[in-house]
Each structure stands twice: as C-alpha cells, then as structure tokens.
Amino acid sequence: MASILNQTQELQESSKVLGHLRCENFFLFPGENTLSDGLRGVLYFLGLAYCFIGLSAITARFFKSMENVVKHSRKVVTIDPITKAEVITYKKVWNFTIADISLLAFGTSFPQISLATIDAIRNMGERYAGGLGPGTLVGSAAFDLFPIHAVCVVVPKAGELKKISDLGVWLVELVWSFWAYIWLYIILEVWSPNVITLVEALLTVLQYGLLLVHAYAQDKRWPYLSLPMSRGDRPEEWVPEEIDTSKDDNDNDVHDVYSDAAQDAVESGSRNIVDIFSIHSANNDTGITYHTVADTPPDSATKKGKAKNSTVFDIWKHQFVDAITLETSESKKVDSIYLRIAKSFWHLLLAPWKLLFAFVPPCNIAHGWIAFICSLLFISGVAFVVTRFTDLISCVTGINPYVIAFTALASGTSWPDLVASKIAAERQLTADSAIANITCSNSVNIYVGIGVPWLINTVYNYFAYREPLYIENAKGLSFSLLIFFATSVGCIVVLVLRRLIIGAELGGPRLWAWLTSAYFMMLWVVFVVLSSLKVSGVI
C-alpha cells in the first residue's frame, strides 16, 4: 500500500513538470478537476490576474499607511542659550534613506517576499528547496531593473530632466545590489554547488543589516565608511505636499479604492474638520492619505480629540459604503453613458476586494502602523492564493514552474514596485526615489526574499536530518543570474551615459527618452527568453 501511495505521489509531482497527467487537485470549486486542462488553464490565468488586481488595491492601502509612518515627527524641546526660553522643534523619526530601504523597498517587495516565504514553509521537511520562490525573485529583479526603468524614463514631461541628487547613497545601494547576485552565484556554483548550508543562508540574511548600516553611514557621511561625494539639493519632505489635480487617470479605481470614502466622510457633516491631505501621485495612482486636524483653538484639547475620533470612524464606515457603491462621484461627472457603464462594471469587479480591504483601519490611527501591519497580512494572504494558482497553471499546462516564476508571476508581484517608482518619477523633483526604489527592492529581494526562506529550510533540515538544503535546478537559476548580471550592466551603462550626455537619468528629449525605454524593454526580453530556454532544456 505504501508503494502505491509513493507511486501516486511521484506521478502527481511529475505532472507538475511534464503536464502529461491530469492534475487531481482543485482550488476554485469542487469538480473542477473534471474539466479539460485547457479550460482549467484559462480559469486559473483569470484567477491569477484577479489576484494581481487585489494586490494592487491592498498595496495602495499599504502606501498610504507607510506615508503616515514616515511623516511622523517627534517634539524636541531645547533651551535657547541667550533668552533661556524653550524652543520647540519637530524632527522626523525616520531617516529617509533607511525608510527607502526598510519601509518602501520592503513594502513594495512584500508580495515577492511573502510568496517565497510561504513556498518555503510549504516545503518544510523536504530536502529540496521549492523553485517558485527564488525563480520569482530573480524574475522580479529583472522586471524591477528593466521595465520599471523603461517606464520611469518617459514619465517626466517633454524636456524635463530629473537626476539623482545623492549619487553616493545610490552607488552604495547599487554595489550591494550587484554583490547580492554575485553572492548568489558563489553559493550556488562555487562554495557548495547545488547545496545551501545553514551558514550560507545566515550570511545572506545578515547582509541586509550591513546594507542598512552602510547606506545610513553614506547618508550621514561617516568617515572611512562613506564615499567622499557631495550631495545635491534634495526635498525636505519624503512625500511632497503640493499636488496637481488637473490630471485624471483611468486606472484610478485600482490604486485608490478609498478616495471616495475619505471624501464622503469629510462631506457628511464634519464641518469642524480641516483636511490636510497629501497623495503619493498627482493622478491619484495610490490614493489619498488624509490627516485630519480639528478647526478649534489649540487649548480645546477635548473637542479636538472628539473631532478626530469622529472623523476616524466616519472614514472607516465610509470605506465599507464605498465598497458597495458602484457609481462614484467621479463617474457621475462623465458625460458618456458608455464610460459610466464601464466605470460601474469596473467598480463591480473590484467590489469583493474593496469590501475585504475595508477592514483595514484608517491610516491616521497610531501614525499608520496598524494599517501598515494589517496591509502586510492581507498581502500575505493574497500571495498565498497566487502560489496555488501558479502551481495549478504549471500542472495543467506543463509549463516549467521556473518559467512561470520569473515571467508572469514575477511581473505581477512586481506591480507595486512599478507603481511606486512611477509615482516618484512623477512627483519628486529628483530621480532619487524612483531609481533608488529599484535598487533597494532588488537588494531586499535577494537578502530577505531568498535569504529568509532558505534560512527557514536550512534550520529545519539541520535539526531534523542533519543535512543541508538541496537546490533542484541550481544550474538554471545560476544561468538566469548570469544573464541578469550581464544585461543589468548594459542598463547601468546607459543610465550613466544619460547622466553625462543629457544631464539626468530620467526625462530629457522625447525621442531619446523613448529610445532608452525601448532599449530597457529589449534587455528584459533577452533575459526572459534566454532564461526560459535554459530551464526548459532547449539550450
């Protein structure tokens, strides 16, 4: 009986790679395994796309909460040495460089990180590491570097130039990002081929801490630990307060599913509230973050607290109201009946996600930390569903799991990175946030996204079997890393040439911007094609 069960398990595992056998598992509804593989593949692809929409929506909530966290200031009381009077100032709690690496990069990369971690937990007890996690993160790194650069370079208006102001911090982040891929190649091919030891996994994770320390040292210009490079002008605020509301984005409903809730909360009788809001994008790509300040005298602390609490509950209540409202205030302003129907249909499509994510508390509670944590939990849940869909797609289509991992799955889970960098390229006066988010996300993907899952598996295998973790397709993964390293050099060289010739990494003459964008996309296609051919055994 045991031999029969083992043979059945082997057949099911082989079906995931070869696609010859029927996949017996079902996920959407009972009896779906009786459908044809082609129909099941279509259903799973649609489900995967719908999950990406959900990831975009919940990431918008994450961005709002993150902005509130970074904007938090602490009161500092000092004594003037001359007048002996108290001087009250407010200083930012977060250093912007650390916030970029630990909050922005970690948050936008959280779908990929959670996918890899969930995959590692599911594979606990297995001597071979799951291929979905590392493949997704390598593909995500390629998507971050090439398509996101391709988008950011054409985002500024025609003739507008946006360059990196702090080249020292960017170079530190870039060097650590390149070293991450070199390090992966060393442990996969040189140090212990096809094996990940506990020491290797631990060293991978610890390098993330070294990145934080080195980047902070460069930002503060610590001697002996920083590059002696001057810093250009940089904005005082991490998120600019000035906005341009003249733009209208048709994709608004994906990234800002709560703007109407906040607006209705303000319009519904809260007349003693002055709204001081900032959005992460001029066209509402990621939604509005509201800061409510009671329009009362400073000494009316009790009234101020009551007004604040009332507004918090009003906004939270209207999040649920907005989730079940098909026609928003913006769609009512549209003259075309067809566009109004399309917008209503889009709201109907988003309604389940909006209703689910309405449980995330408003971002102005506890400086955004509660919403921050809740958003991460929801992202993890959606990421788990994504792993199930990708497993089933690989099973019914016979596509190699690695190919799915660094193409469709990596592109979809990197959508938050694309949104964040695009917004930064639009709103920031410099290119620091847009480009730094790419390099920081890639570093986080490697040191945390690959290091933590491998650390989980190696620790378990060490105590359970006294064995290391084996990599089933190390050559394919190593080949992808080599291709990515080669193409990324071509990307960085073009950015440096744009800096020297045009004067900025982003923007410039429209023709040159579009040519640069096309070149970056070509590099991504080269990476995807060569990596897919390698893991499929063609080359």
From Swiss-Prot:
Protein name: Magnesium/proton exchanger
GO biological process per UniProt: monoatomic ion transport; transmembrane transport
Protein family according to the UniProt entry: Belongs to the Ca(2+):cation antiporter (CaCA) (TC 2.A.19) family. MHX subfamily.
Subcellular location(s) per record: Vacuole membrane
Tissues expressing the protein: Mainly expressed in the vascular cylinder.
Disulfide bonds: none
Role this protein plays: Vacuolar transporter that exchanges protons with Mg(2+), Zn(2+) and Fe(2+) ions. May control the partitioning of Mg(2+) and Zn(2+) between plant organs. Could also transport Cd(2+) in vitro.
Organism superkingdom: Eukaryota
Pfam families for the chain: Na_Ca_ex
Gene Ontology CC: vacuolar membrane
Gene name as annotated: MHX
UniProt keyword list: Ion transport, Membrane, Transmembrane, Transmembrane helix, Transport, Vacuole
InterPro entries in UniProt: CaCA (IPR051171), NaCa_Exmemb (IPR004837), NCX_ion-bd_dom_sf (IPR044880)
Gene3D superfamilies named in the record: NCX, central ion-binding region
